[in-house]
């Protein structure tokens, strides 16, 4: 017998084209063991990325809150997906552990098949799987996350839920066909009995059976086309609300990577039950009309969202306009303040210009005598102009100023006087100005000053312009005895020096 090699080994468990379970098994239910991570309300997802992000967010939030996983049993049947809490109880009489079930107290959640929106597992962690179900009362999507022990177990659970969709779809087709056959038989009977028993209606039992069939029907009632009883098993991760018609019976879904088994949902799964439908729609409403209503509702939601966006933009523009207006007012206030400051500065500058012009006029009207006297005043200041003498000149502390008296004219030059030395580098000459003829002779104390027209000097050495030479009497009275030694060394010297290189006349 030929032995199996690695080339002819076939594992039907991973073949997506082969169903995992028998269809009759879904009537009783297929049970799986897993750990329940948690559930959260999520907005309607539009892509797989949003679903995976919601799945991971639930995991991280429950892990951050330190909420432990609960061991549960997942029951998949035609009635829906039922999650039951599994709990251990010790039986003291039997002295062993047994698993006991109490569905009334341990039921975690139960969702019918047509309300399950999406089912898949995480691509990064294949042990994690989840399904999104829609609540019938509040129409809110809720994501339930689970974790299995093995990756293959999670894949089997996902494929089982997908196969449950297909089984329910087949059952809905059978119910629809039976209802159509019953209606045809009833019409034929009414036509045959129209002559003998016209106006015959259904009895109460028939009405109750028909209503029960309509309530237990998972999908909307639609007459299927003949020759479409066989379903193609294509399991892929797809949006169960995305519907594409193929012959009017089922939809073909996109097949993705084998590592992420995908599920195909019939468009009938999307339709709510007869109790949750709008009052305007009956059980015999065509599927296209329902889709048109869904499209109109989505368009209305889109228009509302666009209106909200436009209103938000208007508010934003108003806020920007108010901010710009406030900034403009602030800028105007600053400009006004700067204009006031500039005005004050211009006034101050104009005053300074006037003062400068007045000073220029005063300086231009000053006579030459005032400038000579100013130079004399600067010369006699201590330290203003150093006198360069030979090394034999004695120090200033060795000099003794003679007292002022009547014999000042006959004062002999001391040895340390710079005016009394002929070989000094700098010599000061005294110029005598003759007074007018009709002027009375000066007093004896004023013999040294002679015809010099002295004016009062400022500290800067510049003669004040506004003081005239005619106020000689006031100027002479202002001189005190302390100011006379300043011209003590000015002598009556008439002759010139021997050379111009060693004498300077001021």
Swiss-Prot record:
Coiled coil: 322-363
Domain PID: 26-196
GO terms classed as biological process: nitric oxide biosynthetic process; positive regulation of membrane repolarization during ventricular cardiac muscle cell action potential; positive regulation of potassium ion transmembrane transport; postsynaptic actin cytoskeleton organization; regulation of calcium ion transmembrane transport via high voltage-gated calcium channel; regulation of cardiac muscle cell action potential; regulation of heart rate by chemical signal; regulation of nitric oxide biosynthetic process
Region span, Disordered: 175-224, 241-260
Free-text tissue specificity from the UniProt record: Expressed in kidney glomeruli podocytes.
Chief location of this protein within or outside the cell: other
GO cellular component: anchoring junction; caveola; cytosol; filopodium; glutamatergic synapse; mitochondrion; nucleus; perinuclear region of cytoplasm
Record-listed Phosphoserine modification sites: 188, 192, 195, 266, 371, 374, 401, 417
Location of this chain's protein in the cell: Cell projection, Filopodium; Cell projection, Podosome
Subunit structure as annotated in this protein's UniProt entry: Interacts with the PDZ domain of NOS1 or the second PDZ domain of DLG4 through its C-terminus. Interacts with RASD1 and SYN1, SYN2 and SYN3 via its PID domain. Forms a ternary complex with NOS1 and RASD1. Forms a ternary complex with NOS1 and SYN1.
Disease: Nephrotic syndrome 22: A form of nephrotic syndrome, a renal disease clinically characterized by severe proteinuria, resulting in complications such as hypoalbuminemia, hyperlipidemia and edema. Kidney biopsies show non-specific histologic changes such as focal segmental glomerulosclerosis and diffuse mesangial proliferation. Some affected individuals have an inherited steroid-resistant form that progresses to end-stage renal failure. NPHS22 is an autosomal recessive, steroid-resistant form characterized by onset of progressive kidney dysfunction in infancy.
Role: Adapter protein involved in neuronal nitric-oxide (NO) synthesis regulation via its association with nNOS/NOS1. The complex formed with NOS1 and synapsins is necessary for specific NO and synapsin functions at a presynaptic level. Mediates an indirect interaction between NOS1 and RASD1 leading to enhance the ability of NOS1 to activate RASD1. Competes with DLG4 for interaction with NOS1, possibly affecting NOS1 activity by regulating the interaction between NOS1 and DLG4. In kidney podocytes, plays a role in podosomes and filopodia formation through CDC42 activation.
Name the UniProt record assigns to this protein: Carboxyl-terminal PDZ ligand of neuronal nitric oxide synthase protein
Species, as recorded: Homo sapiens (Human)
